[in-house]
Amino acid sequence: MRERYDMADNLPNILVIMSDEHGPMFSGTYGHPIVETPSMDRLADEGTTFENGYCNSPLCTPSRLSFMTGKYVSHCQGWDNSTPLDVGRITWPWLLKTKGYDTVLNGKMHMMGPRPLNGFDMQ
């Protein structure tokens, strides 16, 4: 993959942190009086934070399907945690790859089906 790094050197880094069952109020960035999160605080200070997030489904997989595709859950046809992402769906990692990014997934996404990485180069 080294040949791609030269092209990507001028691209800004994009880091998306999506935690499961973690409210922002439990981090120093959002003012918790006791919990200390210095690494997250530094990332927030040097990057972008979002004050008005929206969770499109109370279930893990439908919410992730929507997040990965930018579509409503009803458009992804993901109603439960066993729904695979349709092979024909374009995800934002696929789009980033077309712009020269290397994409890595760290953690779980519960994406089942024939394309479990759904655009990520590696996990």
Model-derived features: where do they sit?
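Formylglycine-dependent sulfatase
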Residues: 1-123
